[in-house]
Amino acid sequence: MKQFRIRKDDKVMVISGKDKGKIGKVLKVLRKKDRVLVEKVNVAKRHMRANPYLQQPGGIVDKEMPIHISNVKVMCDACAKATTVGYRYTEDGKKVRFCKKCNEIID
């Protein structure tokens, strides 16, 4: 199984594509498709049918679409840069992610 260095609720920056440079929070990681849903990034218009049972009106709705995981990088809170994530073990044996630019622990 592949190891994903991006997790839900991470702050990420888009590094390529039409939304290059935008920063957002990861809403969902789609592991089977190698994609992530990022808040307010790669937004498309979708036509929604009205659902009277759930009191949902119909119309055109903006919806976030998945973006490939290779097109985003994790933002480090300490150095405020888009960075590659590495893994290491702490003294007590716990595996943690760290920023490869400033060596600060991310989570």
Curated annotation (Swiss-Prot):
Keywords: Ribonucleoprotein, Ribosomal protein, RNA-binding, rRNA-binding
Gene Ontology biological process terms, A to Z: translation
One protein family per Pfam: ribosomal_L24
Annotated SUPFAM superfamilies: Translation proteins SH3-like domain
Cellular component terms per the entry's GO annotation: ribonucleoprotein complex; ribosome
Alphabetized InterPro entries for the sequence: KOW (IPR005824), Rib_uL2_dom2 (IPR014722), Ribosomal_uL24 (IPR003256), Ribosomal_uL24_CS (IPR005825), Ribosomal_uL24_KOW (IPR041988), Translation_prot_SH3-like_sf (IPR008991)
Record-level Gene Ontology MF annotations: rRNA binding; structural constituent of ribosome
Function as written in the Swiss-Prot or TrEMBL entry: One of two assembly initiator proteins, it binds directly to the 5'-end of the 23S rRNA, where it nucleates assembly of the 50S subunit.
Subunit structure: Part of the 50S ribosomal subunit.
Protein name as annotated: Large ribosomal subunit protein uL24
